[in-house]
């Protein structure tokens, strides 16, 4: 594999016999406010149900109404836990690319053979004025863009992953 540029913060490059693994640790300072919010949200719901179910005659709506909020709380808490412990490995070899996230299950795990990938691109997604994420996309044989790795907070991380994939698979970017 040709010389790589500086490895961006939050990524590790692990050489293998036929390519490399780019490892991204999810943990970042952005997790802290959401973790605090999850604690407050979940504590409120525990308090709510504690109060509602400790009374002898609780109205049904007092138990049913917050069920949707419990679902949201479970989702936020799972995301926070995943953000604290998960890693994503992008294993690139001449034969193809495997993306795996662990230890908590997450979406976007995939294995692609090299002949399925014709180009690798970086896209920026803007969610609000101050919130953007970067996505590494690949173009398939039909030239349709598909997500390879998402949720990257720094463009340098996305560009680095894209470059490692391009170099290992010997793809020349068309920068569509």
Stretch-by-stretch model annotation:
Residues 23-88, 174-176:
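Alpha-helical transmembrane spans
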């Amino acid at each position: 594999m040709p010389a790589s540029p500086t490895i961006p913060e939050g990524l590790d490059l692990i050489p293998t016999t036929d390519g490399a693994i780019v490892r991204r640790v999810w943990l970042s300072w952005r997790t802290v406010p959401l973790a605090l919010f999850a604690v407050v949200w979940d504590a409120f719901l525990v308090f709510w149900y504690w109060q509602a179910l400790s009374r002898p005659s609780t109205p049904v709506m007092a138990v049913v109404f917050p069920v949707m909020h419990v679902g949201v709380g479970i989702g936020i808490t799972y995301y926070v836990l995943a953000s604290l412990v998960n890693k994503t490995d992008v294993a690139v070899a001449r034969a193809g690319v495997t993306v795996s996230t662990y230890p908590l299950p997450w979406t976007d795990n995939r294995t692609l053979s090299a002949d399925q990938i014709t180009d690798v691109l970086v896209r920026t997604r803007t969610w609000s004025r101050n919130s953007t994420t970067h996505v590494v996309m690949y173009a398939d044989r039909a030239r349709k863009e598909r997500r390879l790795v998402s949720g990257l907070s720094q463009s340098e991380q996305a560009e680095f992953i894209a470059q490692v994939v391009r170099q290992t698979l010997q793809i020349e970017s068309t920068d569509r």
